[in-house]
């Protein structure tokens, strides 16, 4: 029984776990992608591995793309200034 648990744990570690999060997708300089229509955001988000996306109007960063289930490997807007 212990062998089964250890093998399962080892397989989990070898495979790795890809987590996802809902967030504003960001440009390399920590700026959001501004938007006007949801279709543009949905395309941007899904091209970057998210499940979907939409244009969030009047949010914390103005009209910006919000992605749902965005992979950890894609940059998101973090607190701090946009470095344009």
Swiss-Prot record:
GO CC annotation terms, alphabetical: extracellular region
InterPro entries referenced in this protein's UniProt entry, alphabetically: LCN-type_CS_alpha_beta_dom, Scorpion_toxin-like, Scorpion_toxin-like_sf, Scorpion_toxinL, Scorpion_toxinL/defensin
PROSITE patterns named in the record: LCN_CSAB
Pfam families, sorted: Toxin_3 (PF00537)
Propeptide residues per the UniProt entry: 84
Residue stretches making up the LCN-type CS-alpha/beta domain: 21-83
Tissue-by-tissue expression: Expressed by the venom gland.
Gene Ontology MF, one: toxin activity
Domain notes: Has the structural arrangement of an alpha-helix connected to antiparallel beta-sheets by disulfide bonds (CS-alpha/beta).
Function comment: Binds to voltage-dependent sodium channels (Nav) and voltage-dependent delayed rectifier potassium channels and inhibits the inactivation of the activated channels, thereby blocking neuronal transmission. Administration to mice at a dosage of 0.8 mg/kg produces an analgesic effect.
Protein name as annotated: Neurotoxin BmK-M10
């Amino acid at each position: 029984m212990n062998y089964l648990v250890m093998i399962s744990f080892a397989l989990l570690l070898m495979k790795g776990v890809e987590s996802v999060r809902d967030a504003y997708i960001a440009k390399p300089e920590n700026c959001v992608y501004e938007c006007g229509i949801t279709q543009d955001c949905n395309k941007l988000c899904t091209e970057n591995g998210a499940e979907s996306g939409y244009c969030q109007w009047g949010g914390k960063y103005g009209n910006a793309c919000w992605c749902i289930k965005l992979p950890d490997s894609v940059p998101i807007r973090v607190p701090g200034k946009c470095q344009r």
